[in-house]
């Protein structure tokens, strides 16, 4: 996972364990926001460890129409923390709303880029 957000209403949204021990667990997190207690692993780098008090999105609670709004706020911890090399790749230089990620030369973590004022 690169430039990803894994969050939710629980204080520990992700746990990594190999219960079978028969095949090595393969994973990697880089430039991500993880709602979890810190996990120490050589496969995890440049991660922001979250907590339930973090205000990341425009609306992280469902509205009356049944929708969330996962665009980052201007003050979001996700702002300007993505891996710029990955964000420069043609497949990732625009967000889910077709906003150019590199307009500030500092892309945001997650599926959406803060659009500016």
For each of these PLM feature ranges, what is it?
Residues 1-75:
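Predominantly extracellular beta-rich ligand-binding scaffolds that present long acidic/polar faces
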Residues 75-117:
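Surface beta-loop-beta hairpin patches that serve as ligand-binding interfaces in beta-rich domains
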């Amino acid at each position: 996972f690169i430039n990803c957000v894994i969050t939710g209403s629980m204080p520990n949204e992700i746990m990594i364990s190999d219960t079978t021990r028969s095949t090595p667990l393969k994973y990697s997190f880089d430039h991500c926001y993880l709602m979890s207690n810190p996990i120490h692993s050589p496969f995890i780098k440049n991660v922001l460890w979250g907590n339930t008090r973090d205000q990341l999105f425009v609306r992280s609670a469902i509205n009356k129409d049944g929708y969330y709004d996962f665009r980052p706020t201007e003050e979001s911890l996700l702002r300007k923390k993505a891996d710029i090399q990955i964000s420069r790749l043609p497949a990732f230089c625009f967000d889910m709303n077709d906003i150019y990620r590199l307009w500030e030369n500092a892309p945001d973590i997650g599926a959406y880029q803060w659009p500016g004022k």
